[in-house]
Regions:
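Terminal alpha-helical segments
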Residues: 1-129
C-alpha cells in the first residue's frame, strides 16, 4: 500500500535532483511531495465523503494528523508552484528549489518509514491472530 506512489515520488525526486533549472527542480520537488501525499491518502483515507471539496493538503492533515505540519508547509508553496507552472519561472531561486527538493525528500522519507512500520505492525498482528 502506497509503494507505487512512493516509487513515483522517488522518480520525481531523482529528476529534481539532476535538473539544472531552478523552476524545473521546484516543480518536480512539489510533484514528488504531491505523490507522497497521495500515498498517505491511499494508506489512510476512508471513503467517507463529507460533501465539501478539499485539496490534497487539507485531506492529508485530516486523515494523518502526524503529517499536518508537512501538509501546511506544502500547501503554503502551492501558489508559487502554480505560478511557476504557468511560466513565471524567475520567482524561484536555485536556493528555494534546493530547499524544496530537500523538504520533499524529508517528507518522503518520513512517510516511507511510518508506512513501513505500519505494515510491519499489521503483519505481526495478523500472524498473532
Amino acid at each position: 500500500m502506497g509503494d507505487d506512489g512512493l516509487g513515483r515520488a522517488r522518480a520525481a525526486l531523482a529528476g529534481a535532483e539532476v535538473a539544472d533549472a531552478a523552476a524545473e527542480r521546484y516543480l518536480l520537488a512539489h510533484l514528488a511531495a504531491l505523490r507522497v501525499a497521495a500515498a498517505v491518502l491511499e494508506a489512510r483515507a476512508h471513503a467517507t465523503p463529507t460533501g465539501r471539496l478539499r485539496n490534497v493538503w487539507q485531506l492529508v492533515g485530516e486523515v494523518a494528523p502526524e503529517f499536518a505540519e508537512w501538509a501546511g508547509f506544502f500547501a503554503a508553496t502551492q501558489a508559487k508552484r502554480q505560478a511557476v507552472a504557468a511560466g513565471v519561472t524567475a520567482i524561484v531561486s536555485h536556493r528555494e528549489a534546493d530547499d524544496l527538493v530537500r523538504d520533499a525528500r524529508a517528507f518522503h522519507d518520513e512517510v516511507a518509514r511510518r508506512l513501513a512500520g505500519a505494515r510491519r505492525r499489521s503483519w505481526h498482528s495478523s500472524e498473532a491472530g
